[in-house]
Amino acid sequence: MSYPVIGGDKVRASRGEIKIEEVLTKAGLVFEEEYSFPDLVSSSGRPLRFDFAVFNDEYELEFLIEYQGIQHYSPKSKFGGYSGLRKQQFNDMKKREYCKKHNIILIAIPYTDEGRINYDYIMNLYYAQGGY
């Protein structure tokens, strides 16, 4: 079951994000899309959103998922070229540091693994990071 978006309007989803949403839904996991924390913002003051937040039955946060499109790894004019890449990577770093500081499991799925996305793939990444 998906819950309302937190932090604003849903941005256009990529194929990888759509696939992740389908896996989470089919598995019956409770999740929210575009999840944000009030104290995690970009250098411009905008909330930094995670693609998915997955919750347990008590609605406590279990882990976060970020699908890393090509714009996370190389400059693309559609995403602001080199400047956009630097901003993206800075924001990615802030998200990783935030999760580490708050003991939150963050699963980052690179676009090169799009074809591998299924329930077992996601859960193996979760368990590899100490999930239970």
Each PLM stretch: what is its role?
Residues 1-132:
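Nucleic-acid endo/exonuclease domains
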